[in-house]
Amino acid sequence: MEKEAFMEKLLSFMKEEAYKPLTVQELEEMLNITEAEEFKELVKALVALEEKGLIVRTRSDRYGIPEKMNLIKGKISAHAKGFAFLLPEDTSLSDVFIPPNELNTAMNGDIVMVRLNSQSSGSRQEGTVIRILERAIQRVVGTYTETRNFGFVIPDDKKITSDIFIPKNGKNGAAEGHKVVVKLTSYPEGRMNAEGEVETILGHKNDPGIDILSVIHKHGLPGEFPADAMEQASSTPDTIDEKDLKDRRDLRDQVIVTIDGADAKDLDDAVTVTKLDDGSYKLGVHIADVSHYVTENSPIDKEALERGTSVYLVDRVIPMIPHRLSNGICSLNPKVDRLTLSCEMTINSQGQVTEHEIFQSVIKTTERMTYSDVNKILVDDDEELKQKYEPLVPMFKDMERLAQILRDKRMDRGAVDFDFKEAKVLVDDEGAVKDVVIRERSVAEKLIEEFMLVANETVAEHFHWMNVPFIYRIHEEPNAEKLQKFLEFVTTFGYVVKGTAGNIHPRALQSILDAVRDRPEETVISTVMLRSMKQAKYDPQSLGHFGLSTEFYTHFTSPIRRYPDLIVHRLIRTYLINGKVDEATQEKWAERLPDIAEHTSSMERRAVDAERETDDLKKAEYMLDKIGEEFDGMISSVTNFGMFVELPNTIEGLVHVSFMTDDYYRFDEQHFAMIGERTGNVFRIGDEITVKVVDVNKDERNIDFEIVGMKGTPRRPRELDSSRSRKRGKPARKRVQSTNTPVSPAPSEEKGEWFTKPKKKKKKRGFQNAPKQKRKKKK
């Protein structure tokens, strides 16, 4: 019997209900093994299954499956404060809390086996790492520091809670303060730290651009394109050829425009709207036909799959495909011929798509419009711009009306519409931050989002009913346990949600967002709600999108910057244009799509993490020269160690309780408030106060505030010293650890899936707050 087949047989045997852990000899007897060769195969299979974590050997040398032995296999998600959670491989199981002393040298991302502890505190399941099956971290980015005989690297990733020991012969030219990439040569063992050698010196930590370069290396973001991909890009023509037009619908005589940001270079979507005689609208969404140029398994395609998505950092874009294509032949630049895939829809006055057609086309856009100019035409009634674009103004007004119809329909069905502010960090040519401003979101931005949403839904539904292998954008229903915590949380503010944690419609959550709109608690309730939900991801199954409250959704509209969109285009070409729906074709895609969906979802999360980190880094840098300055802000979160205050430009800092010196403040957990025991002063979420910047740590991305008007010295230092033991039994070095975990509004889940807009609040001065009466429940 082949090894794989024997392993499968052995695993099936152990999964039987009557099975109890057995020794090798007992298994030999139970499986009627008589030949020496068969016994060798049994031992090899047991070793292989144990290495994969599929079975476990007990101290008495008995073998069984983890689930029957109070064990769970999963991935470690570490926290900067030393503890971690196990994310079980079986997604139906809840996360398991791992205390710091129970990690047993496991690091963030490691695949481990955890034994559940019978005496877990409260309702939270706790566990102990008993075996590390697979190490995740091979390289670490950090700051090099040295002593006389050795060096060490302080990791940028605070989830790695111990420094990396660098022997003298492993520093490879690194000097004090250098940002370096370290290759690990051994992992933590007992009281000894991980050991490594310097592989790359990025530069001194204070050199321009090194901060962002460190983030790029930390997250493993790609650099230059491979030579074969660049060669393919160079050989791609700059203009379309007559032969490219075969079997394409010619739309070059239509009035079609792109509407994007003023600095956008990769224009992958164009739109047109016509009002029909019966009151319906004809909407054309035309997307750059990237799949025509990036063919399957070509060098660019392989690299695009690996990258998964373009990454938009504050000072640069790391593109998914080479700029020669993304900014050139694939970009729908004005007044030039471009190949597209089109989705034309007829939409009635209720926002229903009554007819649609998906086809390949060629277009020539009439104008390259900006959000700013369209907003000035539609919102500000700018006469100069109306005159400049006079032939287009009626279409823009039709677009505005159609977008409102589509939005009304989406909200009526219960889509969850978050209302977070979103910031944009402006930097100079050297990467130094100039300003942090709020991204304006007005009519033009929203109408494009509505058009992209309806096109994505229409394409998804079309292929759902074709019943062929496809890739969808899904957003599953929230985890009942997390949602239950949110429902309990909102009751402290007097709100009651219709439905239960196990059975809730998105409309019920939207009703809460409507109720808190422009109220002090809006930000924190929206944030906690968002965090109670699952992340949207890609999947071969059409499972619907909870947040958008739609049964069918995919990503069709951005093939320049998202690989799943490119796959959707490839499938449109395969199934619709080439008519290949045979069994072999479907089997091929049914086999490939699960891996593509999983990988691109992972690459999307990597990109979001890197983008968020560079934003936070530059926000802290922006505040470095603001120490001593005063700002108006709003309390965005209250914890037992202080209050987080958000400034109007979304920058957030901590007022540590030790800086609240006019009284002794206690944390009222039920009402998320700080209450002065002597004065009765109350600080709660949503209160507007004036703060002074007292400290900024760019490396830790921490900003410290104090409340203006509170005099005196802090009662105790904010920073808590914690020791990190050094390898080889060297004395521990004291490290300053952050004690805060900011509750910040998350950036939009992705363009088009959540809306954001700034909001205005009444200002409350200083710390002289009278206690508020208890809020009444919403009816």
Curated annotation (Swiss-Prot):
Inducing factors: Constitutively expressed, part of a 5 gene operon with multiple promoters. Not ethanol-stress induced.
Domain of life: Bacteria
Keyword entries, A-Z: Cytoplasm, Exonuclease, Hydrolase, Nuclease, RNA-binding
Protein name: Ribonuclease R
PANTHER family named among the record's database cross-references: DIS3-LIKE EXONUCLEASE 2 (PTHR23355:SF9), RIBONUCLEASE (PTHR23355)
Biological-process GO terms, alphabetical: mRNA catabolic process
Top-level class of the enzyme under EC nomenclature: hydrolase
Comp. bias regions, Basic residues: 725-736, 757-779
Annotated region (Disordered), positions in chain: 709-779
EC number: 3.1.13.1
Main location group: cytoplasm
Residue span(s) of domain S1 motif: 628-708
PROSITE patterns (alphabetical): RIBONUCLEASE_II, S1
Cellular localization per UniProt: Cytoplasm
Domain RNB: residue ranges: 248-577
